[in-house]
């Protein structure tokens, strides 16, 4: 396993700026609003051929009555428990605070390497003003400017020398990447916490509580998964604040990174236009899809309730007839145990390969039973089909008229492939191509 490095500290001391500096891309949101990174945010980093997992956290306030800040504090404690090494960040401009002293006292009791860092030291003036921090009595303090990359290289040289890493045990394991998407406050974070078995993501009744797309590795029956709890995707008109805009883009990027997308719907509100747009993002990205109807326990139901809601989903998501539907309650855990099993089945289909012989047997039979319509008065001829890719399964069909295939006939061929080979939960790509002489 890769070693884990956690970045902790009070709100707005520059943790996310340091995180982004080390990751090399803008992964955590950076804004002047305290508490902008509310959850733990993970990234895999490889620095000078030493791989590790870097964890950014929300601000750590030892004493607070604010419920959200209390939750962020608990997330920071979880991160410190998981970590092999801790980077504790303080703010040179804000000076040494009682909260900093409280955290240092707590870190002294942790039997792990801790690096004490004063951030926002942009020059000699700030270096001189940082003298108060040496009263903490720790062995060594590093002064850096994460924003201007001052002192970061020297810091990381020492960090890399201190982290435990056994290259012999490290392997590039296959991992299933799961994105959890949906409108704000449909219960995504509660669902993630239920799947993981502990409070990994801040769950709060306030819509938009999860701002960053947060990655978590976990295993079920020794099988590895990466779970991405995306920020809620709002309608464009509601994406007003700069931070909210970042979150929507982050959620869409999370779909791009995923293998399987859990599209979370709110049973209390039914299917909305925004749900359709979100599902459309996943479909257009070519990802495996599962509908998860959450808050099912809150509805008054009869024997036809599931059938009626299923019909509503199929009517509104006609482009996803292959996506399984699960009715769950993240709050109570009802049926959530079925989700990972369904993910495994969809992933199997998402990676499925069919031999050229099997494929052409089904394809030839389909064409014989239903000939393609004429194209500009020409008869459409098909030569053969072959699978060229997985994730999603993609096929090339060679024909004399690649531009003249009607979309309804394309859908017919894909339906015949599904009837023969399954492909439940995954989109298919079908490409019609003219036959070159070398293909003859």
UniProtKB/Swiss-Prot annotation:
GTP 2 binds at residues 182-189, 229-233, 294-297. Keywords: GTP-binding, Nucleotide-binding, Repeat, Ribosome biogenesis. GO terms for biological process: ribosome biogenesis. The keyword Repeat applies. Residues 3-167, 176-351 form the EngA-type G domain. Residues 352-436 form the KH-like domain. NCBIfam families: GTPase_EngA, small_GTP. Belongs to the TRAFAC class TrmE-Era-EngA-EngB-Septin-like GTPase superfamily. EngA (Der) GTPase family. This is GTPase Der. The gene is der.
